[in-house]
Regions:
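N-terminal secretory signal peptides that target proteins for export/translocation
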Residues: 1-11
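Intrinsically disordered, low-complexity regions enriched for glutamine and histidine
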Residues: 1, 26-27
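Extracellular, repeat-based ectodomains that mediate carbohydrate processing or recognition
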Residues: 27-458
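Bacterial N-terminal signal peptides
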Residues: 11-23
Length: 458
């Protein structure tokens, strides 16, 4: 948490189309996707529609945007390759707090947006107590969304508390379970509690009918964590699907990086396997931010290239004395793993921090694309962004600076817990929060590569 249909026509009444873009020598275009009336948007995600790559959907929360006094979830939709965007609110008939937004597409162009939905957290005697995770579905590229289906929901209680979902659709052409939707997340017995009897665990559910219903959630973590929401909490579970429908999940916690998998379409999982340590933990103190993290995310190469089936894990830790971005991979379903590859290419042990990393593996060309916040070129709290791309199976990366002016975060403004990126057919689109004249906004950077190469189209 670390904090009826909605129509396209109604969306234009809530937010106008807003465009801010410029092109630099690397043929990169930065476009602001939140309109001027957006209030503190954060926790971003983005997905490219494989049926129509000019159609993309990004998502974020906004803090207290009228008419609602609470944080709510929003979609940002484009049909022209990212040149212009329209804001579409996520349905919220119950008027609950929303957040931790993640959006994905299925191979047939159906969009899924999962988010938290809760009220009464951190209140001793809440007037209203409810919490869960809702999945909204769009079959028209994000113009309209279903009211939402609970993947899990608790009425009249916030214990346990469900937090930080990751979602994936099985888009593997040869999978027996193609089209299944999988969600993994952290369950807190009591969110924020330091009581050692209160535990956190990783839970899982699936849908086999395009998000209309979800199975009974079950625990997949063999070893849990505490409920403090820090290094010893199990968190950061992001599912990925292999070419034969394997479901892979990696999370962070007191044991380090932990891996689990399902070979039966998400009906059951095996024993946890610790695949790496996390020097310095996953919860960081970053100047200018209320909090920051290096929690892992996962993705699989579903292309027909030489690295098909490779599972990648991307995270941040302090093994070199400062915070660096890393990638590790397995080509045999998690039995053996590569050594960690340092993704950021600034000088080793230079004391500069990277944080909030996210990854997308292009399903057509197999490239590994990673975005992260970066302080290599600045001092103090000034922050930039870097996009790193690998076309050799994650062995080496080319780092490119995203062309936004360095900014200083405001610790009094919630900055979220992650960035986002999506890649498809050589098109790569990172999405991120940044400050412009003291105001928090969300932008995308539009890159177009010759597939499978580092060559950028002009």
């Amino acid at each position: 948490m670390r904090q009826k249909f909605t129509s396209w026509t109604n969306a234009t009444r809530v937010g106008i189309i807003f465009l801010l873009s410029f092109t630099i020598a690397t043929a990169q275009q930065v476009v602001r996707i939140t309109e001027p009336t957006a209030i503190d948007p954060a926790e971003v995600s983005i997905a490219i529609n494989p049926k129509n790559p000019d159609n993309m959907i990004a998502a974020s929360l906004q803090i207290g945007r009228p008419p609602g006094p609470r944080a709510g979830s929003y979609n940002y939709v484009t049909f022209d390759g990212g040149k212009t965007w329209t804001t579409v609110p996520t349905p919220n008939a119950s008027k609950l707090v929303q957040g931790d937004d993640v959006v994905v597409f299925s191979s047939d162009g159906v969009a899924y947006h999962v988010h938290l939905s809760f009220e009464g957290i951190r209140q001793a005697r809440p007037a209203r107590a409810e919490n869960g995770m809702i999945v909204n579905v769009s079959k028209d590229g994000g113009k309209t969304w279903t009211d939402g289906t609970p993947a899990i929901n608790h009425v009249n209680t916030v214990t346990p508390f469900e937090d930080k979902p990751g979602i994936v659709v099985d888009n593997a052409p040869a999978s027996r379970w193609k089209g299944n939707t999988y969600i993994a997340w952290t369950r807190f017995d009591v969110y924020g509690s330091a009581n050692p009897e209160h535990r956190s665990q990783i839970y899982f559910t699936r849908s086999t009918d395009q998000g209309q219903t979800f199975s009974m959630p079950f625990r997949i973590s063999d070893t849990g964590g505490d409920c403090v929401d820090s290094d010893n909490t199990v968190e950061g579970a992001v599912p990925a699907v292999g070419p034969n429908g394997e479901v892979y999940i990696v999370w962070a916690g007191p044991l380090g990086l932990v891996f689990d998998k399902s070979l039966d379409g998400g009906l059951s999982f095996g024993k946890d396997k610790v695949i790496g340590n996390l020097p310095g933990g996953w919860d960081f103190s970053i100047q200018g931010l209320e909090r920051a993290n290096g929690m892992p995310n996962t993705a699989v190469d579903l292309s027909n290239g030489p690295n098909k089936g490779t599972l990648y894990v991307n995270w941040i830790d302090a093994r070199n004395g400062d915070l660096d971005v890393f990638l590790m991979s397995t080509r045999d379903g998690g039995e053996t793993w590569s050594l960690p590859v340092r993704v950021n290419d600034d000088k080793l042990k230079n004391g500069k921090e990277q944080f909030f990393t996210w990854m997308s593996v292009d399903p057509l060309d197999g490239s590994v694309n990673i975005v992260f916040y970066d302080r290599r070129d600045s001092s103090g709290a000034l922050t930039g962004l870097t996009f790193a791309r690998s076309v050799d199976g994650g062995k080496t990366f080319v780092n490119r600076k995203i062309d936004v002016p360095p900014f200083a975060p405001n610790s009094n403004v919630f900055f979220g817990d992650y960035s986002g990126i999506s890649a498809h057919g050589g098109r790569v689109v990172p999405v991120f929060m940044h400050f412009v004249e003291g105001k928090l906004v969300v932008s995308v950077a539009l890159f177009k590569f010759k597939p499978g190469t580092q060559e950028i189209f002009p």
